[in-house]
Regions:
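Conserved catalytic network of the ASCE P-loop NTPase/AAA+ motor domain
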Residues: 42-46, 65-70, 95-99
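Conserved G1/Walker A P-loop phosphate-binding module
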Residues: 1-34, 45-48
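Amphipathic helical hotspot of TIR/SEFIR-family domains
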Residues: 82-107
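Switch II (G3) loop of P-loop NTPases
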Residues: 45-63
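Conserved Switch II/interswitch segment of TRAFAC-class P-loop GTPases
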Residues: 69-89, 110-114
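Conserved beta-strand/loop subsegment of P-loop NTPase cores
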Residues: 72-76, 98-111, 123-129
């Protein structure tokens, strides 16, 4: 089973990304050798286990095994802004503590990579545009953009 950790600063769009994953979704299976923790959101999709951890939580010592369990880390950033100190701190923490784990950047709320994000050009970067607003606090991302990422992950593991 492949584990995909979705993380990023507060407000970057992690929950929107997770909520936008296609249906049907299966039940998340807790990996071996990690503490049983309450995850913000988790699911199985096409043989991949997705789980969401907020950036402040991800950098806590209690969560280090969850971070190391991931086969891929999807780091969500607010694409309409430049990388902020929270994104940079999280990025540096992940690079230092999990140097051999593949990382993908998902820029939320945009359809283009701006100059400020080019620092990370050695990593695969995806853009995810806005889908629809459900209410003032809830939205879903562009279905086509999310499917592109899921397809990439599936092909990566074939």
């Amino acid at each position: 089973m492949k584990h995909i950790m979705v993380t990023g600063p507060m407000g970057a769009g992690k929950s929107t990304f997770m909520r936008s994953l296609p249906k049907p979704q299966g039940n998340f299976v807790i990996p071996d050798n990690v503490p049983d923790m309450m995850l913000d959101y988790s699911c199985e999709l096409k043989g991949m286990m997705f789980y969401e951890i907020d950036a402040p939580t991800a950098t806590g010592k209690v969560w280090i095994n969850w971070i190391k369990t991931a086969n891929i880390q999807l780091i969500i950033g607010n694409g309409i802004r430049k990388p902020d100190e929270n994104f940079i701190e999280l990025w540096n923490y992940l690079v230092k503590n999990t140097p051999n784990i593949k990382r993908l950047i998902v820029l939320n709320r945009t359809d283009k990579i701006t100059k400020e994000w080019e620092t990370y050009s050695s990593e695969k970067i995806f853009c995810v545009g806005m889908g629809e607003t459900i209410d003032e606090e809830t939205a879903v991302a562009s279905e086509n953009d999310i499917l592109t990422i899921v397809d990439y992950l599936e092909e990566y593991y074939e």
